[in-house]
Amino acid sequence: PVRIRSSPRFQPLPHFFIMAKLERLVIHCTATPPGREVSAADIRRWHTAPVSQGGRGWRQVGYTDLIHLDGSVERLVPNNEDRTVDPWEITNGARGYNATSRHIAYAGGVAADGTTPCDTRTPQQKSALEHYVRDFVARFPGAAVVGHNELAAKACPSFDVQAWLR
């Protein structure tokens, strides 16, 4: 099983969404250069800070979990670990798919220049992601595992998820 540590400062969303069936796991990268660690606070700031302050202005972060460089997995948004996506579990990872998805990101995904997409996963991150995906598939049979780039015109997660799954 994957060990996940909780992140502080969780803020639930208002309960105006209808609960939906979990249909997929979406794999993301943080679009940071190799070796740069990313914290839950970084993700929160990037995603929820007002646009005027350099953020995206979202109500919630884009990922359920974050895989750090050392392979540890940090929970950013708590969930019930069941097949239903409750309103407070919804993250903003892929427009049009969020109510039926969980999202995981690994720290990295771009070359040292900070812009060129590049699979920068460390061996520890690759192992953690493999265990995470295997656990997800075992717990939620029939749910898809996709890269963000399969749902939107993005390079994220900077590797071919379907080829990797084979």
Question: Model segments located where?
Answer:
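Basic/polar, cationic surfaces and motifs that engage anionic cell-wall
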Residues: I4-F10, F16-T30, P34, G57, ...
